[in-house]
């Protein structure tokens, strides 16, 4: 017999046994060489004939010329249905077939080939992949071939697209004279999905999962092929195995076709089909013509544009081989191709190990989503299809529903579809719902969604959960959604979605998708001005300020930034923007992106719960609360007034606006909060211009207010280099006498202001540049508060022994010529220098103590006493010295120092907004924002002994101890 080798191999598996250390071996004249064991049936074909109740299946085998294969050769695994199962099938099936005689050849092939695996497998081994790797196999190939069924589609059966801006790939085939199209629904072969105990255990698919997905209960060792139960397992034949099913196995179609034909997901299927196209398949055409003759000119396959890593389709080459042979790049796409029979999630997971999942909303739910007053997708139709939406008469008015939904651009509607497509079935069973993430990587489902599952459809390449809920993507629920769909906020949408900054994709859209955050997003309409701070840096000794006009170029469909010159009057703070774009000195594309990044972060406020400090939980109120000042993502203060009036009077200002009496009005308001919509993360406000931050630095604010704060500015700004050189052995030596820092680093540590790439300080009376050394040395890309004591307060401190650079200079006699200085012994000079070093240490720590981490404003709400760190470090403890800030509300602010002194902010200098820029290669590489307040007294980082500063160095020993405790280390 031709299959005797297979039979012999089965018998010989019992030949060698090892049990309890005993081995039984086979001789060469083993009896099963000439005689079959009793459990071994004849061939698969003969076995079925002998049993007598498989006449329908035998007819399939005979009609398709498979009798010799299944009677004389091997090896096969067959899943068969008996005549009783066929009787039930004829009574009710989707094909409308009432008897065997009514089956077409294609249908016969589908039944037989889909039930046949081209190898002999024990059922329990079918859960193993090649290796073998037990418990990994969910699906496997069968004898089915794509040519078993290549249907013909008439024009009215093909996808339609009502969006005039979309290229309709199907249009030419819908023309009646064309006569339709012969099309494979995919050019890969259908696979068999089986639920076997070992694979389910390995992938932690529970019996409850199975019952929800398949709609049946299972016992421990049950095996199912799709929803067909194996009633009789592993009937062993001489050329393979037969398994009897409880019903006729009809391999289901792929997910795309199943959604198109099940009658409950027509709208969702239509939405997905907008991403499909017919692709000419030369190989399939040749095979078809070889098999069926030359009556068919061409065979096409239906594919879906997708961005899957493993098998992406992002070019339409092949849709028009003659007219456009090279095709075009496609900018939209689904998560994966739902029509791909041989679906594979990625290179690490084979097609046998997993399949896809779609959480498809029913027609009823999608209709509510788009057309009900509170539907989560209504804003899309309001933006793109207001007229078409008005024409829809109800759920049954499918054509007008399609017409309306199709107006939503594909690169917008894909967010909804892709959120509902998950790449791995084994990780998406009901028991794992809480691990499934949405497009923001937040939890998308929980156990309550089990009640939302209307039914599960098993396709040949995945599972479809029919959902009584539309799981809206974060992209639609987030504050960025209005910009995402609006036609007049495209510049900001570009910044959110596609901006590249410093050579790296910003991916700000992902940040704004966080549903656990609460945002207020301000979005200027296209056509807004931005005062470019970098343009105030002199080039070739000239300053040419410019404003950038951001708008959307309709011709190129791209963001555009045009530079215009500014005429600026520093004395009055007024300016005019020129009418003609700059021919030289215009911002480059890199600079445009850089400033757009600054705009993006300035317009985004991330709210926090500040109940403990101000009594306001901003995560609940957003900006609609009893305060005016808020900090944006990059630390820029934003002033908000009339917040609850929305588009009827709400205004916002940045530092530039406050200093130039300009404001941006809210022209549209979108509530995207979770409280209102069930999912969301804040409020979106469209404004009529950009919020522009200040260009004034801490240095500039002090320099140009010397009439009030000249003494503090003088202490911060004075040249102390000669003093530091003299005291270097006392301030920059370790215990072994080695330098702690390089000379440059040492000198920098005793400076308040440095040249760190910041904007120059302009004298507001003359307009001339004072200096470019304007950056606070210890600011570090954060937000701060600077307290500025009045001249009277500084003078009182000086009278109490606070050293000044001038007094230290005089104490060291550096203001005298060398020959005029007092002669001292080495010990006397040592003692003097130690005391002078203590004075320097005291003065530096005094100044730094007025620079506080975190920005605190004199605003409407009262503030509970709250401690904040300053820039002064107790080097002995390693702890930064703190101040305690409080307010009784209504614009007041009090600061209490370590010594217990409470100072109040001055009404004539409070809430002054400043910013220290760090500019590199004409880009804003970093910046620090601060708010400045004048105060009516100085702040002391320690309690004064006898009310005097100089008590800390009245002896050499005291001076040394003081230096040790407060040495300047950063």
PLM regions: where:
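Sec-dependent bacterial lipoprotein signal peptides
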Residues: 1-26
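Mature, structured domains of secreted/extracytosolic soluble proteins
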Residues: 25-970
């Amino acid at each position: 017999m031709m299959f005797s080798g297979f039979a012999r191999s089965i018998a010989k598996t019992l030949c060698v046994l090892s049990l309890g250390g005993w081995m039984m071996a086979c001789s060469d004249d083993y009896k099963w060489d000439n005689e079959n064991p009793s459990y071994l049936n004849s061939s698969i074909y003969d076995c079925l004939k002998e049993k007598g109740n498989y006449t329908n299946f035998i007819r399939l085998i005979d009609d398709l010329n498979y009798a010799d294969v299944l009677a004389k050769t091997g090896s096969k695994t067959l899943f068969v249905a008996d005549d009783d199962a066929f009787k039930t099938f004829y009574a009710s099936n989707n094909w409308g077939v009432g008897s065997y005689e009514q089956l077409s050849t294609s249908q016969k092939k589908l039944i037989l080939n889909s039930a046949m695996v081209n190898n002999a497998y024990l059922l329990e081994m079918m859960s193993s992949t090649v290796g073998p790797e037990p418990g990994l196999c969910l699906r496997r190939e069968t004898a089915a071939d794509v040519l078993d069924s290549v249907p013909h589609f008439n024009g009215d059966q093909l996808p339609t697209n009502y969006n005039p801006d979309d290229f309709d790939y199907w249009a030419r085939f819908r023309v009646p004279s064309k006569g339709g199209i012969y099309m494979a629904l995919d050019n890969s072969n259908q696979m068999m999905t089986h639920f076997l105990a070992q694979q389910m255990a390995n992938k932690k698919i529970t019996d409850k999962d199975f019952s929800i997905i398949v709609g049946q209960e299972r016992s421990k060792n049950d095996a199912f092929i799709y929803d067909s139960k194996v009633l009789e397992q592993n009937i062993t034949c001489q050329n393979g195995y037969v398994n009897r099913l409880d019903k006729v196995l009809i391999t289901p179609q792929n997910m795309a076709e199943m959604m198109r034909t099940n009658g409950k997901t027509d709208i969702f299927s239509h939405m997905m089909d907008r991403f499909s196209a017919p692709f000419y398949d030369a190989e399939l055409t040749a095979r078809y013509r070889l098999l069926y003759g030359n009556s068919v000119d061409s065979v096409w396959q239906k594919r879906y544009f997708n961005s899957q890593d493993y098998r992406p389709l992002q070019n339409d080459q092949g849709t028009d081989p003659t007219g456009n042979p090279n095709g075009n790049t496609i900018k939209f796409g689904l998560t994966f191709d739902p029509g791909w029979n041989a679906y594979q999630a990625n290179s690490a997971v084979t097609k046998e190990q997993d399949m896809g999942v779609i959480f498809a909303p029913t027609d009823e739910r999608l209709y509510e989503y788009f057309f009900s007053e509170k539907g989560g997708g209504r804003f899309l139709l309001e933006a793109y299809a207001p007229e078409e939406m008005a024409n829809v008469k109800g759920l049954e008015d499918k054509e007008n529903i399609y017409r309306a939904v199709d107006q939503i651009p594909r690169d917008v509607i894909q967010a909804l579809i892709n959120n509902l497509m998950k790449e791995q079935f084994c990780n998406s069973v009901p028991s794992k719902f809480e691990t499934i993430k949405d497009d923001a990587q937040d939890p998308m489902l929980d156990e309550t969604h089990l009640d939302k599952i209307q039914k599960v459809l098993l396709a040949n390449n995945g599972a479809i959960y029919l959902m009584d809920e539309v799981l809206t993507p974060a992209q639609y629920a987030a504050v960025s959604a209005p910009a995402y769909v609006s036609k007049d906020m495209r510049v900001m949408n570009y910044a959110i979605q596609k901006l590249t900054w410093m050579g790296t994709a910003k991916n700000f859209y992902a940040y704004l998708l966080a549903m656990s955050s609460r945002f207020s997003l301000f979005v200027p309409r296209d056509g807004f001005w931005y005062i470019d701070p970098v343009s105030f840096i002199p080039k070739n000794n000239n300053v040419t300020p410019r404003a950038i006009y951001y708008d959307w170029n309709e011709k190129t469909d791209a963001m555009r930034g045009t530079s215009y010159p500014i005429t600026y009057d520093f004395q009055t703070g007024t300016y005019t923007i020129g009418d003609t774009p700059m021919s030289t000195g215009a911002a480059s594309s890199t600079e445009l992106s850089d400033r757009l990044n600054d705009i993006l972060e300035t317009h985004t406020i991330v709210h926090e719960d500040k109940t403990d400090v101000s009594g306001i939980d901003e995560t609940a109120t957003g900006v609609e609360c009893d305060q005016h000042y808020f900090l944006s993502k990059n630390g820029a203060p934003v002033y908000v007034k009339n917040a609850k009036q929305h588009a009827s009077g709400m205004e916002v200002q940045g530092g530039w606006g406050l200093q130039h009496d300009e404001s941006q009005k809210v022209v549209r308001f979108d509530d995207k909060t979770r409280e209102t919509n069930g999912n969301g993360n804040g409020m979106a406000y469209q404004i009529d211009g950009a919020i522009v931050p200040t260009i004034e630095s801490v240095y500039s604010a002090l320099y140009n207010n010397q009439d009030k704060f000249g003494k503090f500015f003088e202490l911060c700004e004075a040249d102390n280099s000669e003093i530091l050189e003299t005291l270097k052995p006392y301030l920059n030596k370790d215990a072994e006498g080695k330098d702690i820092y390089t000379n440059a680093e040492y000198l920098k540590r005793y400076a308040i202001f440095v040249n760190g790439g910041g904007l120059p300080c302009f004298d507001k009376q003359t307009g001339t540049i004072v200096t470019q050394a304007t950056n606070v040395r210890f600011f570090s890309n954060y937000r701060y508060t600077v307290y500025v004591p009045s001249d009277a307060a500084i003078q009182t401190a000086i009278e109490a022994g606070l050293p000044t650079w001038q007094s230290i200079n005089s104490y060291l006699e550096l203001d005298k010529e060398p020959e005029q200085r007092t002669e001292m012994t080495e010990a006397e000079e040592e003692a003097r220098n130690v005391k002078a070093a203590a004075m320097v240490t005291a003065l530096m720590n005094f100044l730094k103590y007025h620079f506080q981490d975190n920005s605190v404003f004199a605003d409407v709400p009262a503030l509970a006493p709250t401690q904040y760190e300053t820039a002064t470090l107790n080097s002995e403890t390693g702890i930064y010295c703190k101040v305690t800030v409080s307010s009784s509300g209504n614009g007041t602010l009090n600061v209490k120092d370590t010594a217990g002194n409470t100072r109040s902010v001055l009404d004539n200098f409070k809430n002054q907004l400043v910013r220290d820029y760090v500019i590199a290669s004409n880009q804003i590489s970093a910046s620090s924002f601060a708010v400045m307040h004048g105060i009516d007294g100085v702040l002391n980082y320690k309690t004064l002994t006898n009310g005097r500063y100089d008590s800390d160095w009245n002896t050499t020993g005291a001076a040394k101890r003081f230096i040790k405790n407060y040495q300047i280390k950063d």
